[in-house]
């Protein structure tokens, strides 16, 4: 559709100048962004469209500068098509907020041309209903988002290849099926990657061997690349989000997802209840008659909810305190699903504190240096704490959250300091 201005915006506003307290709304698309500027009373001052590139962002910002002081700019899709514009507006000093898409009622009555969506976005900013502080996409959280997105695609591709290998083996010649029948998936991938298929294909068995070999090698390459991304994410987490890694049950990918959900400015989330709603763990009353029950919010970020779910499962398996809690709640008549829901709500509270409150300075990142000052090896510490050297390595490198052992490790080194 050919976008045209409803009001001329190519020249300076005619006198008298528009009153102060303007708001703006932007409807973002892949190729163009449409802007609308409204007065505090809701009257439309101007609408215009700009290319969705850096020059267009600069032109849009300059256009806003000419119109006068703005209370806020509402942008649809600040984490998708509007990400670049949001960064430019923030750098220019504009209060930029995320605007939810127009309601279906608005679109049913007024249609869906871009100026209508843009004006609706600006009026949403005026009402204050359906807006939130936009995520900061210029810091470590954005770095983690990009790395996590790539890793997720690599793992998905590796899973698809695994399924294809099993499917091909199902119809492969019997000698191949018999050779690999009893191998689990990791051993199967390793064996297939080590095979040496012939250069010339003359039989179905040779063709199957070659196909399986190349898929297995690709599977290994995908996992190696995913592991390199994992190491990069871990380094960013260690530097900027050590509190998340200290959460019991939060590995690198889980901690990364929670950091991405919160964004680079977690302070935009007003409190831990709002964070629980964001992660879809806030209980919603679902009582009926004499039964008092709660259910979870079906909305929110499902990937963050899945991350909290994984933490809950880890704690149910390995954390004595969580096991005791689960046993007590079971005796009270709670089901396993209800117990996990309660756990996820408590974990969301813990994660919010890890995101918004700085961790203590003496964390596991300093334990290795502390140990070396006493000229101790990881094996020496492991023997003293009656554990394995690998567990000490896990603690020092943030590979595995072990809070109880970490506390004992810290106490052991503190005792050595006093001797």
Regions found by a protein language model. Name each.
Residues 57, 246, 252-336, 397, ...:
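Phosphate-backbone recognition surface of nucleic-acid-processing proteins
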Residues 15-39, 121, 154, 257:
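Gly/Thr-rich phosphate-binding beta-strand-loop-beta motif of the actin/hexokinase/Hsp70
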Residues 227-250, 258-264, 366-369:
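Extended, structured, electrostatic nucleic-acid-contact surfaces
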Residues 31-55:
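Short glycine-rich, Thr/Ser-proximal phosphate-binding strand/loop in the N-terminal lobe
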Residues 353-373:
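A short, Lys/Arg-rich alpha-helix, primarily the initiator
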Residues 147-243:
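Glycine-rich, often acidic, oxyanion-interacting loops/wings at catalytic, nucleic-acid
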Residues 375-393:
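Short alpha-helical DNA-recognition segment
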Residues 90, 96-134, 146, 187-188, ...:
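Short alpha-helix plus adjacent loop in nuclease-associated cores
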């Amino acid at each position: 559709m050919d976008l045209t201005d409803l009001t001329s915006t190519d020249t300076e506003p005619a006198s008298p100048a528009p009153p102060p307290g303007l708001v703006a709304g932007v409807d973002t698309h892949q190729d163009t962004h449409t802007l609308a500027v409204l007065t505090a009373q809701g009257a439309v001052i101007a609408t215009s469209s700009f290319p969705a590139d850096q020059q267009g962002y600069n032109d849009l910002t300059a256009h806003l500068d000419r119109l006068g002081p703005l209370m806020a700019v509402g942008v649809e899709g600040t984490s998708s098509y509007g990400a670049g514009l949001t960064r430019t507006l923030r750098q220019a000093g504009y209060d930029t907020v995320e605007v939810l898409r127009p309601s279906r009622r608005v679109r049913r009555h007024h249609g869906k041309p871009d100026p209508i969506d843009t004006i609706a976005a600006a009026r949403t900013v005026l009402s204050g209903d359906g807006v939130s502080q936009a995520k900061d996409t210029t810091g470590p959280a954005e770095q983690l988002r990009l790395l996590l997105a790539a890793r997720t695609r690599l793992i998905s591709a590796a899973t698809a290849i695994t399924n294809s290998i099993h499917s091909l083996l199902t119809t492969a010649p019997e000698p191949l099926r018999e050779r690999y029948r009893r191998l689990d998936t990791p051993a199967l991938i390793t064996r297939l990657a080590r095979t040496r298929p012939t250069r010339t294909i003359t039989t179905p068995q040779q063709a199957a061997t070659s196909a399986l070999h190349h898929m297995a090698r690709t599977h290994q390459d995908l996992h190696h690349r995913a592991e390199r991304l994992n190491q990069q994410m871990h380094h960013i987490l260690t530097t900027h989000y050590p509190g998340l890694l200290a959460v019991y049950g939060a590995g690198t990918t889980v901690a990364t997802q929670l950091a991405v959900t919160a964004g680079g400015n977690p302070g935009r989330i007003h409190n831990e209840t709002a964070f629980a709603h964001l992660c879809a763990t806030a209980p919603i009353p679902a009582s009926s008659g004499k039964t008092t029950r709660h259910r979870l919010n079906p909305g929110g970020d499902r990937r963050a909810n899945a991350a909290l779910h994984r933490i809950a499962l880890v704690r149910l398996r390995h954390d004595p305190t969580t096991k005791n809690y689960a046993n007590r709640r079971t005796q009270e008549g709670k089901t396993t699903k209800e117990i996990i829901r309660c756990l996820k709500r408590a974990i969301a509270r813990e994660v919010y504190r890890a995101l918004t409150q700085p961790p203590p300075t003496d964390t596991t990142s300093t334990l290795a240096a502390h140990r070396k000052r006493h000229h101790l090896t990881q094996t020496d510490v492991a023997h003293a704490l009656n554990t394995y050297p690998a567990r000490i390595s896990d603690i020092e490198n943030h590979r595995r959250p072990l809070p109880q052992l970490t506390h004992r490790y810290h106490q052991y080194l503190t005792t050595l300091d006093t001797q």
